[in-house]
Amino acid sequence: GIVGMGGAGFPTKVKLSPKEPDKIEYIIANCAECEPYITADYRRMLEYTEDLVSGMKVILSLFPNARGVFAVEDNKKDCIEKLQKAVADDTRMDVKALMTKYPQGAERQLIYAVTKRAINSTMLPADAGCIVDNVETLIGIHNAVIKGKPLMERVVTVSGDAVEKPGNF
């Protein structure tokens, strides 16, 4: 199965199986890569835009009342433009430019930035009508569902002052 690629490895099946699926209003693509030096999601957004959008469509097919929102920090204008073009003809998806600041990509902050709904530490995103997945997870969903390719790899950034040849691998 697919696990979340944001770091915790949470099973995507569980995330996509809320107790009240009809109350899910937002599927938020966490495209806010706010940590210094990290650019893996940025490159994936640029190079695999169609796969990213396709992964969102797969999730939206499970939640007929939901809208898909690609939440991208405003310092990634090229990604914003490319995603806007990719979703221009789809009335259920849009792109939201977020202020570039840390920790914009943290789930609770991201939900608030997109929906203005605050969730406390006892709540899950579904309690606020949201499901949040990151770039790599959405591309993994596309690869698994559309291409039949299992999720067995991910792109990571290796960078910093001590790295001789930084890059995304």
Put a short name on every predicted segment.
Residues V3, E25, A66:
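Short acidic/polar active-site loop segments enriched in Thr and Asp
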Residues K13, Y37-T39, A106, P166-G167:
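Short helix/loop capping segments that flank catalytic or ligand/cofactor-binding pockets
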Residues V14-C34:
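Short, compositionally biased "basic patch" segments
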